[in-house]
């Protein structure tokens, strides 16, 4: 039922970073919102990352960000086209291959996972865009580099969209902004000022607004895409989400990776679906698992169960002659809670620490060093003044067929999927009379999903928290109050 789509993703690396700089900055400045995703070299202790205390959890993520690095950054710029029917967006997606110039830890699990999903470490070490972590050094902030690109992102003052994004935000801060503050309250205070238009977490939106059966990235994206396609095919009232991409010609073709989003095919009969992957989008057996990891089949299976239970409830209510209450099967917790009670202990890899009872009952999936519990990626756009790409609602034609990598896991395409989920959720909650400054999804504004917690992390400055000195100085530079870049030692 879902429609096919080919997403052009622009691969950005050291040999074309300056050439594509103007295009990236224009895409950022003209967007309605920006979705971001990262690939990391590791995360460290999984037990510490799921600590009951949020302050302890933050310290563990900080330690990971200071000792590990961002290997790849993806961002998708969604620009709403006001002259088009419904909710139509021009989407431009970029996938940046990065190389930290400082020593960092890279975990074997991360390498294995990324290689399985097509990450090219040879290309990273040969052509990765260099960056350093912590505070600014000298005049580097004024050049064409990652820190300057992050400044452009802040200056654009656009809503930022992430998926399960607390870890992403901590790594972005340490790698491209400044040294991380020691306390969570200070970090949150800084974050609230860095992104005044708000931060939205589609993991939170999927769990508590859309209330899907599962909330890992690929599942949420394909479910949104399927529901949107059904609504269009049904011809009912209401707005729908449509996407347009740029057409690329000439030398730009060599930079683009076309990522296919194919139709899901209905399959009858018993589906041998991996229960672990179905619940979390992650399986310890990886590609060696004998059960199906096909997200389309998983969604089809969930839809069938939902429909069967709806019919059963209808027959039961008809028999009783009364309208029964909606049952718990519509809750997104059911699949996970049932699975956790019966399968999780057996499915955890030997190399991972055993989950606590608090973690078992959490509505979250196991965490891999590189966000292995989420899947997808994409990129796009040319910024040459001489030959601006022409916008088109048609899927771009690929110059040659490329063999798809295992899965769709790349930072750029993950960012695209994150943005699509947000566009779909926004479309469901959109107020036609809202002002340009109103929150895009008020119920999800500045709420970061917390694994194992029933409440999100609110990105709002507390009256008891002060901003860090490095952040205050950096904000002066971002908004033009200061042209000097403070030495590295600023705390």
Tell me what each language-model feature is.
Residues 1-491:
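DEDD superfamily 3′-5′ metal-dependent exonuclease/proofreading module
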């Amino acid at each position: 039922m879902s429609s096919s789509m080919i997403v052009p993703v622009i691969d950005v690396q050291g040999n074309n970073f300056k050439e594509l700089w103007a295009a990236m900055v224009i895409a950022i400045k003209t967007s309605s919102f920006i979705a971001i995703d990262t690939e990391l070299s590791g995360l460290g202790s999984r037990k510490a990352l799921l600590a009951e205390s949020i302050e302890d959890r933050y310290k563990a993520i900080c330690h990971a960000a200071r000792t590990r690095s961002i290997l790849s950054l993806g961002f998708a710029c969604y620009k709403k086209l006001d002259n088009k029917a419904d909710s139509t967006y021009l989407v431009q997606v970029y996938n940046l291959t990065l190389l930290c110039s400082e020593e960092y830890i890279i975990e074997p699990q991360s390498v294995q996972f990324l290689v399985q999903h097509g990450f090219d470490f040879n290309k990273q070490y040969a052509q990765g865009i260099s960056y350093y972590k912590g505070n600014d050094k000298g005049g580097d902030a004024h050049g064409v580099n990652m820190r300057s690109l992050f400044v452009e992102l802040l200056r654009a003052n656009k809503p930022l969209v992430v998926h399960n994004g607390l870890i992403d935000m901590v790594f972005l801060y340490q790698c491209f902004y400044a040294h991380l503050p020691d306390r969570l309250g200070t970090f949150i205070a800084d974050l609230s000022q860095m992104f005044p238009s708000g931060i939205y977490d589609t993991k939170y939106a999927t769990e508590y607004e859309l209330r899907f059966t599962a909330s890992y990235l690929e599942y949420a994206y394909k479910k949104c895409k399927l529901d949107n396609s059904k609504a269009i095919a049904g011809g009912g009232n209401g707005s729908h989400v449509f996407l347009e991409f740029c057409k690329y010609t000439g030398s730009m073709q060599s930079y683009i990776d076309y990522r296919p989003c194919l139709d899901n095919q209905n399959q009858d009969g018993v589906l041998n679906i991996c229960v672990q992957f179905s619940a979390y989008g992650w399986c310890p057996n990886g590609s060696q698992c004998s059960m199906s990891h096909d997200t389309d089949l998983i969604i089809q299976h969930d839809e069938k169960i939902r429909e069967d239970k709806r019919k059963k409830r209808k027959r039961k209510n008809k028999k009783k002659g009364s309208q029964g209450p909606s049952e718990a099967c519509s809750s997104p917790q059911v699949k996970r809670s049932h699975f956790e009670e019966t399968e999780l202990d057996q499915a955890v890899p030997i190399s991972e620490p055993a989950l606590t009872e608090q973690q078992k009952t959490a509505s979250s999936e196991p965490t891999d060093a590189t966000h292995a519990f989420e899947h997808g990626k994409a990129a796009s756009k040319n910024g040459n003044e001489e030959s601006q790409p022409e916008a088109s609602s048609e899927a771009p034609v690929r110059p040659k067929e490329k063999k798809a990598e295992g899965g769709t896991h790349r930072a750029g395409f993950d960012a695209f999927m994150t943005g699509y989920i947000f566009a779909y959720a926004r479309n469901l909650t959109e107020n036609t009379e809202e002002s340009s400054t109103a929150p895009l999804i008020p119920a999800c504004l500045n709420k970061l999903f917390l694994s194992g917690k029933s409440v999100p992390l609110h990105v709002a400055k507390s009256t008891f928290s002060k901003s860090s000195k490095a952040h205050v100085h950096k904000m002066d530079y971002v908004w033009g109050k200061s042209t000097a870049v403070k030495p590295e030692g600023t705390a």
